Amino acid sequence: MKKSLIFITFTLLVYTTNAQSIVGKWKTIDDETGKEKSIVEIYKKGDKYFGKIIDILNPKKKEKNCIKCSDYRKDQPVLGMEIIKDLEQDNNEFEDGTILDPENGKIYDCKIWLKDKNTLNVRGYVMFFYRTQEWIRFS
């Protein structure tokens, strides 16, 4: 009985360690400046994953609108904006979705994956050209 309990506990620990999720809040870090920019909440809707900006860390930019957006988000507040759309899980990666850069209004193909349980790699790309940022889990 004691051995069974130890085995079950060990199995649950291993399972939860390996089953890390991208769902949650992430602090975005600008890959060019190293500055913290915002908090993005990633969530699952149906079989797909989405992300929206829930906080902007620079007080001067909290009221900013997406003036360079060319889709339905044009002139909408960046705070609360859905910037990641339609990601699908493929093993340990999430891909086939898009990400919006509210600074320039451009929409890129998107792929994300966990580097470790507290670091998320976020890649925006067009064909062979890409940028990858590391986002930090926010609690």
Identify the meaning behind each predicted range.
Residues 1-21:
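Bacterial Sec-dependent N-terminal signal peptides
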Residues 30, 35-100, 107:
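Central antiparallel beta-sheet cores of small beta-barrel/beta-sandwich binding domains
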Residues 21-35, 133-139:
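K/E-rich alpha-helical interaction surfaces of small helical-bundle regulatory domains
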